[in-house]
Amino acid sequence: LGTSVRMIGETLFSAAEDADVYVSMARHKRTLELLKAKEDNGALVINSAYGVERCERSLLDVALREQGIPVPNSEGSDGYWLKRGDMSAQHKGDVVYCKDRAELTEQQASFVLRGITNWIVQAHVPGDLVKFYAVQSGFFRYFYPNDDGISKFGDEEMNGKAQHYGFDVAGLQATAETIAMLTGVEVYGGDAIITASGAFYIIDFNDWPSFSRCRDEA
């Protein structure tokens, strides 16, 4: 990145900042607008602020379904996941499991009381939960969070102990790369469910995941 690297908090970033390359984990709308202006003026921003906006969950859900990417249906018999649609989960209550339609309706009402009217609904898919981390250059790793116990909000427990079902790893990587191209991000990660039959479903995708399990390697 050169000989001079400066770190700055997202809320302190301003139009006066000047650099050739911006490595950004920003999510605030104001900051993204500033970064888009930097991109428009020729600066390299990783991840692109335009790409980060396209990772908004409700927008991405529509795009993935239109492109035929394997994602859970909105109807199912094993419960539902209600997910805040305007951003990635920042709080435990932003992604909620509902055992049936009645509970889903209750949780949607709870979202409205919190001022949240943008959401998506995904049917729960039984199977192994895997988390993947990737960089556009070809780096791709996946892990079973229920093997190491590392969890952000504990929702991983809903899928139980990993059975390590066989699946097409190259296919998962190719699908993740397709989503990265659709959104325009270079550093990304997400979650997928692997069913007993070996099928996989993308249940989450985001820019700049934690890389907690492979940070040094990445």
Write out the residue ranges for each language-model feature.
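Conserved N-proximal alpha/beta basic substrate-recognition cap immediately N-terminal to
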Residues: L1-E75, M87-S88
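Anionic group-transfer/hydrolysis microenvironments
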Residues: R27, G85, H124-V125, Y133, ...
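Short glycine-/acidic-enriched loop or helix-start segments at secondary-structure transitions
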Residues: L32-L35, R57, H91-G93, K131, ...
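Conserved anion/nucleotide-ligand pocket segment
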Residues: Y80-E103
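A short linear hydrophobic-aromatic micro-motif
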Residues: W81, N118-V121, V187-G190
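Phosphate-binding site of ATP-dependent enzymes
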Residues: C98-T183
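Conserved metal-phosphate-binding beta-hairpin within the catalytic cores
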Residues: A180-R215
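Catalytic phosphate/metal-binding cores of nucleic-acid and nucleotide-processing enzymes, i.e., regions
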Residues: A218
